[in-house]
């Protein structure tokens, strides 16, 4: 039929239009060592392709090549694939090419805010103490009132005393709707 690499692959999955692979790709690498399509080959010698159609009649996303409405963040493979390392792990985007696991160590250990010096309080007593201390803690200071808008330099413009323009200007300047 055609020479598209997706036809010669063993899996019958949609192929990404960006990288030509069956894996997640941002277009800068391939996750499959199979041949990569540049979108210039044709499926029929009589037809010319712009690289935006597939042999599958279902609508295809132009971003990722999947057969569903796409926002560009889905994968063809149910296992998530890291864009940097290419491994099938769930990634938070902070991975490197080093496969060794990375553990974050805090700069200093967390010290408790309340220290019990004597006795063995129960969990209910500690909860009551924390609730009382939380309720008496200072609240946020009241917000500063908005400065008055009367007496602005615009009020000193020289309009006649009975001018409708002055009244309208003052209303527009000082009255918020």
From Swiss-Prot:
What upregulates this protein?
A: Protein level is maximal in exponential growth phase and declines during late log and stationary phase.
Q: Biological process GO annotation list?
A: carbon fixation
Q: Where is the composition biased (Polar residues)?
A: 18-100
Reading the lineage from the top rank, the first entry is: Bacteria
Q: Outline the segment boundaries, as ranges, of region: Disordered.
A: 1-112
Spell out the GO cellular component terms annotated for this protein, sorted alphabetically and separated by semicolons: acetyl-CoA carboxylase complex; peptidoglycan-based cell wall
State the oligomer form and interacting partners. Answer: Interacts with the AccA3/AccD5 biotin-dependent acyl-CoA carboxylase complex. Interacts with the AccA3/AccD6 complex. Is also part of the long-chain acyl-CoA carboxylase (LCC) complex, which is composed of AccA3, AccD4, AccD5 and AccE5. The four subunits are essential for activity, but AccD5, together with AccE5, probably plays a structural role rather than a catalytic one.
Role summary: Stimulates activity of the AccA3/AccD5 biotin-dependent acyl-CoA carboxylase complex. Interacts with AccD5 and modulates its carboxylase activity for acetyl-CoA and propionyl-CoA. Inhibits activity of the AccA3/AccD6 complex. Is also required for the activity of the long-chain acyl-CoA carboxylase (LCC) complex.
The name under which this protein is listed is Biotin-dependent acetyl-/propionyl-coenzyme A carboxylase epsilon subunit
* Organism the protein comes from: Mycobacterium tuberculosis (strain ATCC 25618 / H37Rv)
Classification of source organism: Bacteria, Bacillati, Actinomycetota, Actinomycetes, Mycobacteriales
Q: Which gene encodes it?
A: accE5
